[in-house]
């Protein structure tokens, strides 16, 4: 598989996809959710699992990375997608996206704010809190440099903290969404409460 160069896509993405297809097991019958999907899976040395899905119908190549060191121990997804050409868009542009589970802040009222686990992501592996260095190491066959080892350890520690510590979850929400501002301008005024004199 050869994919276009798109912003955010790591240079080792194609090597990873092709290596999993060649060395991994064909698990299409077990995991396919559509008719024209091809799915291969490879278990890495540390027990983590990499699954590559090629979906011909929507032009997507998806990599799912399952590791106990991911945020909330949930899978991380890297996806390259180039929509199929049609009359409205004869030359569609490809895009690369990432996704993982992460804390998300939701306001349900002026005094009601909750942190929930939901899918968060971006357009680059830099947008992930989980460490995906094992994927690069497997794809390229190269051991990480000392600088990369330190960066990867920081990332793993951060993922563990977010998974286990409420304060780290709050910090992650603020980093992604900004600080919570329950200003009264955001909520309705008047209505039945004003008519009742409250």
For each feature predicted by the language model, list its residue ranges.
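Short low-complexity linker/loop segments enriched in small residues
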Residues: 1-198
């Amino acid at each position: 598989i050869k994919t276009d160069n798109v912003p955010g896509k790591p240079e080792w993405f194609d090597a990873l996809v092709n290596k999993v297809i060649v060395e991994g097991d064909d698990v299409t019958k077990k995991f396919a959710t559509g008719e024209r999907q091809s799915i291969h899976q490879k278990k890495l040395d540390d027990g983590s699992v990499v699954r590559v899905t090629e979906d011909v119908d929507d032009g997507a190549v998806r990599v799912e990375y399952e590791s106990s060191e991911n945020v909330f121990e949930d899978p991380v997804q890297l996806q390259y997608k180039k929509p199929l050409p049609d009359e409205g868009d004869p030359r569609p542009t490809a895009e690369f996206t990432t996704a993982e589970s992460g804390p998300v802040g939701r306001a349900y009222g002026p005094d009601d704010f909750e942190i929930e686990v939901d899918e968060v992501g971006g357009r680059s592996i830099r947008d992930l809190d989980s460490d995906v260095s094992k994927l690069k190491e497997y794809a390229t066959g190269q051991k990480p440099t000392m600088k990369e080892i330190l960066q990867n350890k920081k990332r793993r520690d951060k993922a563990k903290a977010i998974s286990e510590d409420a304060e780290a979850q709050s910090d992650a929400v603020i980093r992604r969404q900004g600080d919570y501002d329950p200003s009264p301008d955001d909520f309705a005024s008047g209505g039945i409460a004003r008519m009742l004199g409250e």
